[in-house]
């Protein structure tokens, strides 16, 4: 049955929103993997665990917003399989942050592509929705991750585990 509320909502936009929902859920799934890796007894970096758990929750909220948007525009939700994260072992905090940065850049590019599709189909509602709820937040997340990576690299945290521990405790808010 067709939606009664659908107006100026192109099928390409609808399909792209469904793909974006999947990408946000994949990001949440990846961050969940990172969070529980860092809370293992042999890794024990609670600040990193907390940071990645918060990121997982945030990505899930992004997916929920897109699901709500899809319904409000009269689109249909077609969930897809969520891909497994690229790995199960995340290495050091620096390694995980570098993976996180790449993930956020991929999400950002997908959002920019989604915005272009909306713009090409003259959908000001979708453009406004993406600009209001996603685009600036992505840039801020990428900047924050870049700053964390710079500081951990500056402290030579790969070789200096005390630096990683202190970064976890003081920057990431880890508590024993």
Swiss-Prot record:
Decide whether keyword Oxidoreductase is in the record: yes
Identify the residues that bind Fe cation 1: 24, 59, 62
* Any single Gene Ontology cellular-component annotation: cytoplasm
Q: What is catalyzed by this enzyme?
A: 4 Fe(2+) + O2 + 4 H(+) = 4 Fe(3+) + 2 H2O
Q: Which UniProt keywords apply?
A: Iron, Iron storage, Metal-binding, Oxidoreductase
Q: Which Pfam families does this chain map to? A: Ferritin
Q: What class of enzyme is it?
A: oxidoreductase
Residue span, Ferritin-like diiron domain: 7-156
Q: Which GO terms describe its biological process?
A: intracellular iron ion homeostasis; iron ion transport
What's this chain's function? Answer: Stores iron in a soluble, non-toxic, readily available form. Important for iron homeostasis. Has ferroxidase activity. Iron is taken up in the ferrous form and deposited as ferric hydroxides after oxidation.
What this protein is called in its record is: Ferritin, liver middle subunit
At the highest ranks, the source species' classification is:
Eukaryota, Metazoa, Chordata, Craniata, Vertebrata
């Amino acid at each position: 049955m067709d939606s009664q509320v659908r107006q100026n909502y192109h099928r390409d936009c609808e399909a792209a929103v469904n793909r974006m929902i999947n990408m946000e859920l994949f990001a949440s799934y990846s961050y969940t993997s990172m969070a529980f890796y860092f809370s293992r007894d042999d890794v024990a970096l609670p600040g990193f665990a907390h940071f990645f758990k918060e990121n997982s929750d945030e990505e899930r909220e992004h997916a929920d917003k897109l699901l709500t948007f899809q319904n409000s525009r009269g689109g249909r939700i077609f969930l897809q399989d969520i891909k497994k994260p690229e790995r199960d072992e995340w290495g050091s905090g620096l390694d995980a942050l570098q993976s996180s940065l790449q993930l956020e850049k991929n999400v950002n590019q997908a959002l920019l592509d989604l915005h272009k599709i909306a713009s090409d189909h003259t959908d000001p509602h979708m453009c406004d929705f993406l600009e209001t709820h996603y685009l600036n937040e992505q840039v801020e997340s990428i900047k924050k991750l870049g700053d964390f990576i710079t500081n951990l690299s500056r402290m030579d945290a790969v070789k200096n585990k005390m630096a990683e521990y202190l970064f976890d405790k003081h920057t990431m808010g880890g508590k024993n």
